[in-house]
Regions:
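Small-residue hinge/turn detector
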Residues: 66-78
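Glycosyltransferase-associated regions of secretory-pathway enzymes
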Residues: 1-65, 83-261
């Protein structure tokens, strides 16, 4: 049984931005029976493991929440969302299949065969308390050295760590298909991340339950500049390859993600 509580994290003591407030309002609208609990420095010990202590000291608050979400769900159970996730319809059918996570990106080779796939627990995940997968993730983070990885430019995202852990346990993704590993349900990309890099827009389907707006709060100014350059380079490369097909979508990507600014 999944406790009727939605967890999110907001470290750093800054005000919640308008996007986060909008997303939290959507949780209240579509999951009205759930309590919403915002975790921060006042109710979560950021010094409990070296990784979160170091990340907090470096003001990399999103990395603090990477560990925190697993600890919080392991202790309490419930649903977790990143604060840039907007729910657009009732989640009852999804929660009934918990524990669950969602695919963020899929890459395909010839004949639409998946060659890489990533699962992002920030899109939304739910579990009863004491789930062993969350314990495995907590144990992993306890071994990490944030400051060393940051210095060596070796920091990994929670998406990388989670996907690698699932694959070590035998998870094999399939395009557009709900899959399972152990007792965890993994929903395809269109369920929680309907953004299309091809069209530059959200492609909402009957299977879409939420939208991830990608606030990217963990990125430094330098990393955001690198992302900007990647988008600009991608724009001209794809425009050269297929101008009529890609121009409209790529202009929309650049405008929506504001990579020119």
């Amino acid at each position: 049984m999944i406790p009727k509580i939605i967890h999110c994290c907001w470290f750093g003591r800054s005000e919640l931005p308008p996007l986060a407030q909008k997303c939290i309002a959507s949780w209240r609208k579509y999951l009205p029976d759930y309590e919403i609990k915002i975790w921060n420095e006042d109710n979560f010990d950021v010094n409990q493991i070296p990784y979160t202590q170091q990340a907090y000291r470096c003001k990399k608050y999103a990395f603090v929440s990477d560990y925190a979400r697993f600890k919080i769900l392991y202790d309490n159970g419930g649903i977790y969302f990143d604060t840039d996730v907007e729910v657009i319809r009732s989640m009852d059918e999804i929660v009934s299949q918990a524990p669950y996570m969602g695919v963020e990106t899929e890459s395909y080779a010839l004949y639409e065969k998946i060659i890489s796939c990533s699962v992002n627990p920030g899109l939304g995940l739910a579990s009863p308390p004491q789930h062993p997968f969350f314990k495995d993730m907590m144990d992993l983070y306890k071994m990490l050295d944030f400051e060393k990885d940051k210095k060596d430019y070796a920091l990994k995202t929670i998406t990388q760590y989670t996907s690698e852990m699932l694959q070590r346990k035998g998870w094999i993704p399939q395009k557009g298909v709900i899959t399972k590993i152990d007792d965890i349900t993994i929903f395809p990309k269109q369920y929680f991340n309907p953004f299309s890099s091809k069209t530059g827009s959200f492609e909402i389907t009957d299977s879409t339950y939420s939208i991830h707006h990608y606030a990217s709060s963990w990125l430094t100014s330098r990393q955001k500049l690198i992302n900007k350059n990647k988008y600009v380079s991608l724009f001209f490369w794809l425009l050269h390859r297929s101008p009529k097909h890609n121009l409209k979508g790529l202009i929309r990507v650049i405008k929506e993600r504001k990579v020119w600014h």
